[in-house]
């Protein structure tokens, strides 16, 4: 009788543990692949869309994106960084790019006299400006240099963060160094800016968990798979990977070397894959979120 009770208890605990994993995974479900059934594009793995020869709804399947120049009905049917414009998939153009008023699509700008421009030369958002520029007081200006004043991270270069009103180098301070933000610490070694104001080891990183309270005050318990939930840090969202600093440096150097003004597959084909591999290798959102993880991973092969 005791043996039966023990077996029942083991089965019960197993079911509870599995259900905990499934509960966390409800917000991170597996997605349908090419030719698998779907109702909406959100059912499909990114960047696939729901729709095929059968159309949407009944009998629809997840389909590969339509290439540049192909007929389309919506943006999500086109390849990433393209847009459906005048029923055709078009490459997004950015500020300063040459354009055709009837055939081109200028992202966050308009085609004026053959060039993507901001009407009145007044910007309202950073995405209207070229790479390494941001919108400040209505003008697109170069990003602030290290040590310069700033009010947010987007005012600084990719290798800098805005901390205490100054652009400072990211991810370099060693254990025990005084910090105001985890962006200053060696996050790819598993460090964060602790409650004591010093760079400290985040001991729970990627340890197994059942709920957020298992992961510390700035951590979250996240579904990695149906059988495994792990702790991640919310302040930066970094993974422990010694290759990440060199990936970031390689991307930054590539953009300078190639003189790219936009970080897109067409605007900077040599550098964009480095950036996407960096995103997958170094941040849990891009490695664990199952709707997009394979897309990001494809750039690391």
Swiss-Prot record:
Query: Which GO terms label this protein's molecular function in UniProt?
Result: co-receptor binding; receptor antagonist activity
This protein's major location comes to secreted
Q: Where in the cell is it found?
A: Secreted
Provide one Gene Ontology biological process annotation.
negative regulation of canonical Wnt signaling pathway
Q: Which residues are glycosylated?
A: 19, 59, 102, 180
Task: Keyword check for Transcription, yes or no.
Answer: no
**Keyword terms of this UniProt record:** Glycoprotein, Secreted, Signal
Which segment of the chain is annotated as a signal peptide?
A: 1-21
Q: Which InterPro entries match?
A: Diff-Dev_Assoc_Protein, DUF7107
**UniProt xrefs under Pfam families:** DUF7107 (PF23416)
**A GO cellular-component term linked to this record:** extracellular space
* Name of the featured protein: Uncharacterized protein DDB_G0272530
């Amino acid at each position: 009788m005791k043996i039966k009770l023990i077996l029942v208890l083991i089965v019960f605990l197993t079911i509870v543990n599995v259900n905990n994993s499934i509960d966390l995974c409800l917000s991170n479900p597996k997605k349908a692949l090419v030719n698998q059934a779907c109702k909406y594009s959100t059912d499909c793995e990114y960047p696939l869309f729901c729709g095929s020869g059968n159309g949407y709804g009944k009998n629809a399947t997840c389909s590969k994106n339509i290439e540049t120049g192909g007929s389309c009905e919506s943006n999500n049917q086109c390849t990433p960084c393209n847009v459906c414009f005048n029923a055709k998939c078009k490459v997004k153009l950015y500020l300063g790019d040459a354009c055709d008023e009837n055939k081109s699509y200028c992202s966050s700008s308009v085609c004026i006299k053959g060039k993507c421009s901001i009407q009145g030369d007044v910007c309202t958002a950073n995405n209207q400006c070229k790479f390494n520029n941001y919108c400040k007081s209505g003008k697109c200006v170069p990003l602030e240099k290290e040590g310069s004043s700033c009010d947010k991270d987007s005012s600084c270069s990719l290798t800098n963060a805005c901390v205490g009103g100054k652009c400072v180098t990211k991810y370099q301070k060693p254990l025990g160094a005084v910090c105001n933000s985890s962006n200053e610490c060696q996050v790819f070694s598993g460090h964060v800016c602790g409650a004591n104001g010093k760079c400290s080891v985040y001991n729970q990183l990627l340890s197994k968990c059942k709920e957020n309270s298992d992961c510390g005050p700035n951590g979250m318990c996240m579904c990695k798979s149906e059988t495994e939930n792990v702790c991640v840090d919310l302040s930066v969202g970094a993974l422990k990977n010694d290759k990440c600093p060199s990936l970031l440096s390689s991307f930054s150097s590539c953009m300078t070397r190639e003189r790219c003004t936009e970080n897109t597959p067409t605007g900077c084909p040599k550098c964009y894959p480095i950036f996407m591999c960096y995103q997958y290798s170094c941040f849990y959102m891009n490695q664990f979120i199952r709707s997009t993880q394979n897309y990001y991973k494809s750039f690391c092969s």
